[in-house]
């Protein structure tokens, strides 16, 4: 986060602010652990950490507020959103971080720096659950159950919601006010009698749901003499650590776990003083359902939980209240999020005893990411957060690991004209010759459960870590990782022989992809100005094709004499992509039509305008260089000229392509071995 005259940069997005918002946004950024106060132009850091801590403490103190219920109503008159429900607060938190429209689909900035390749599941989650729940539609009376494979992002998603809510309550839009001294940080509006709630709605436009808790009902009479307007209200800030507005429940041994973990328990230190278990002062309202009031509760491994714990959720989700001790039903407004895997969920719904809970649950699938580029970003993030971030990972290493992983998650296309690699490229947004967006949509609709199985990111990162430690050097490449992935399959107890065979095939496919990438990389390094060489060859080819199709002659650049189109040059390029003698005429005409179409649209046909032609140019360039590369890279005792060339190529790989000297030399040796096969 850093400030400017116009706004505040926070969480990689720009949020316009005015002076009154700066304070809360500063706290928002600090609470989100993103505080970097610096000059926008120079990047100069202005404060050391102790100064930041002091400033954070001072600003947090300034955000605190305390006043009477009457003064709270004045705040509501100015800022009616303060009284929003828990579901509404979560939705607005996501919305306020920014929403982008990409190809007709919504992408939420709130999730963008932690969850990759899950745009569709996240859009479904927000638009089919959070948005209607924020509008008080019936979906808010459901437990949100995230279902997906291991390491698919379920826990990360829930953690983001929890951390985000903590930070959001420091902002003006996310402010939460509660009755002071209430262990459940209860909504002050619960004090308004039911008979006056319609009048309150007419005046403020705010609906009130829920009843005053037994403890606050007693306090209202005994401490304030029934005078609602004098009850003290305070601003509260959600914190999982302080058990304010965010709760987490994790099942343990059914024999030892007590329902009090959810709903609170009798306070044995005060029971003698107050003399009755039905006296709310002799009860500890410190269960997870109590503490998560106004915010959210994470129910870990919900489907493994003992049934007696789940029944409390029936009333809470449907009616907004739960039973605790010898009291009337206690109102609670909270989002309940649970997560599970597909196997546990199938087992749960097959049990007839759980039918009552089925209708109280809305299941949101969270599959694995199916885009190789996004998978690569996941690995980059995980490595950045590890202790091996200083190890040099050669270019394309993580990309090849990602390709392998995605191939294990994809299902074989039902149509015979497309293979798994082409399907992966289509999913990744690449243009694949002969396939359209309609074909992509058809592929995506073939299987409803695609992405619910395959290799998980943690396995890949574990194998990369193993490679780094075993190799005991500060550099690894794609071949090292593929070998480690292959070896790891033998140690993976849950992989059947059938799956192992499939995964080994995926490693072979990923290896072929790497072979092509490696050859192109070396090719670019050998040609000093690769793009210029490719452009020159392309222009030469297009001039000849145009002359051929129009039955014209070309001019010799030296003598100026008319000459026939260079058939040898054209065929040497076309043969690289399998264009036969019979097909050459139609291919050339198709190129000319494409050039005309570009010209009509005011565009220039260039090296990147035709996938197959680009591939042909690349292969032709490499074919011309093949012998040079082969001799240079495979000679055990290179002469002075060859050595100079190798050093030049290594330097170019290091300076322009992101290699270090070790990985550059390994790449050259590998490509040399490929060409000598």
Please tell me what each predicted stretch does.
Residues 3, 15, 20-23:
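Short hydrophobic targeting helices and cationic amphipathic motifs
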Residues 21-22, 27-46:
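Short, Lys/Arg-enriched N-terminal segments with co-localized hydrophobic residues
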Residues 46-80:
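Long, basic/Gly/Ser/Thr-rich N-terminal segments
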Residues 76, 80-677:
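Conserved ASCE/P-loop NTPase catalytic core
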């Amino acid at each position: 986060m850093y400030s400017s005259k116009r706004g505040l940069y926070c969480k990689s997005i720009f949020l316009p602010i005015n002076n009154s918002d700066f304070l809360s946004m500063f706290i928002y950024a600090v609470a989100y652990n993103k505080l970097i106060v610096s000059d926008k132009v120079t990047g100069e850091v202005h404060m050391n950490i102790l100064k930041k801590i002091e400033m954070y403490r001072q600003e947090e103190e300034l955000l605190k507020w305390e006043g009477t219920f009457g003064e709270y109503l004045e705040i509501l008159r100015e800022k009616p959103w303060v009284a929003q429900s828990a579901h509404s607060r979560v939705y607005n938190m996501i919305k306020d971080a920014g929403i982008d429209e990409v190809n007709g689909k919504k992408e939420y900035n709130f999730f963008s720096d932690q969850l990759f390749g899950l745009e569709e599941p996240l859009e479904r989650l927000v638009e089919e659950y959070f948005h209607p729940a924020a509008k008080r539609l019936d979906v808010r009376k459901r437990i949100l159950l995230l279902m997906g494979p291991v390491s698919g992002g379920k826990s990360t998603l829930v953690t983001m919601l929890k951390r985000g809510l903590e930070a959001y309550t420091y902002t003006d839009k996310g402010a939460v006010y509660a009755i002071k001294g209430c262990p459940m940080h209860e909504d002050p509006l619960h004090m308004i009698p039911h008979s006056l709630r319609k009048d309150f709605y007419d005046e403020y436009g705010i609906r009130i749901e829920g009843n005053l808790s037994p403890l606050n009902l007693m306090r209202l009479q005994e401490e304030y003499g029934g005078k609602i307007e004098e009850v003290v209200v305070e601003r509260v800030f959600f914190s999982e650590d302080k058990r304010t507005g965010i709760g987490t429940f994790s099942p343990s041994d059914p024999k030892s776990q007590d329902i009090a973990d959810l709903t609170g328990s009798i306070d044995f230190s005060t029971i003698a003083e107050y003399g009755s278990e039905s006296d709310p002062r002799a009860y500890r309202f410190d269960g997870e359902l109590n503490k998560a009031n106004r915010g959210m509760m994470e129910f870990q491994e919900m489907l493994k939980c003992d049934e007696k714990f789940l029944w409390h959720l029936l009333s809470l989700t449907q009616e907004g209240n739960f039973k605790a001790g010898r009291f009337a039903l206690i109102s609670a407004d909270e989002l309940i999020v649970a997560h599970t895997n597909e196997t546990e969920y199938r087992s749960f719904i097959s049990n007839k005893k759980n039918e009552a809970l089925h209708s109280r649950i809305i299941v949101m699938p969270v599959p694995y990411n199916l885009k190789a580029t996004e998978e690569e970003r996941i690995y980059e993030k995980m490595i950045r957060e590890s202790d091996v971030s200083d190890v040099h990972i050669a270019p394309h290493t993580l990309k090849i690991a990602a390709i392998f992983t995605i191939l294990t998650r994809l299902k074989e296309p039902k149509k015979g004209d497309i293979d798994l690699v082409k399907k992966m490229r289509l999913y990744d947004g690449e243009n694949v010759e002969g396939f359209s967006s309609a074909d992509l949509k058809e592929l995506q609709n073939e299987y409803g459960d695609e992405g619910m199985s395959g290799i998980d990111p943690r396995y890949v990162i574990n194998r990369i870590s193993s490679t780094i430690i075993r190799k005991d050097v500060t550099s690894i490449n794609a071949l090292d990782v593929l070998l480690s992935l292959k070896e790891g399959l033998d140690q993976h107890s849950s992989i059947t022989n059938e799956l192992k065979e499939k995964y080994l095939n995926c490693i072979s496919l990923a290896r072929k992809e790497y072979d092509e990438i490696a050859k192109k990389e070396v090719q670019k390094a050998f040609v000093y100005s690769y793009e210029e060489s490719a452009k020159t060859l392309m222009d030469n080819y297009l001039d000849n094709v145009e002359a051929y199709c129009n039955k014209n002659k070309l001019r010799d650049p030296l003598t100026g004499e008319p000459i026939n189109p260079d058939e040898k040059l054209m065929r040497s390029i076309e043969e690289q992509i399998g264009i036969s003698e019979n097909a050459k005429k139609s291919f050339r005409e198709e190129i000319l039509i494409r050039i005309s179409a570009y010209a009509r649209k005011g565009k220039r046909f260039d090296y990147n305008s035709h996938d197959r032609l680009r591939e042909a140019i690349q292969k032709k360039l490499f074919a011309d260089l093949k012998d040079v590369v082969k001799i240079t890279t495979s000679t055990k005792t290179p002469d002075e000229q060859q050595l100079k060339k190798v050093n030049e190529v290594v330097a170019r790989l290091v300076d322009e392509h992101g290699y270090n000297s070790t990985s550059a030399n390994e790449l050259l040796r590998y490509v040399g071995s490929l060409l000598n096969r």
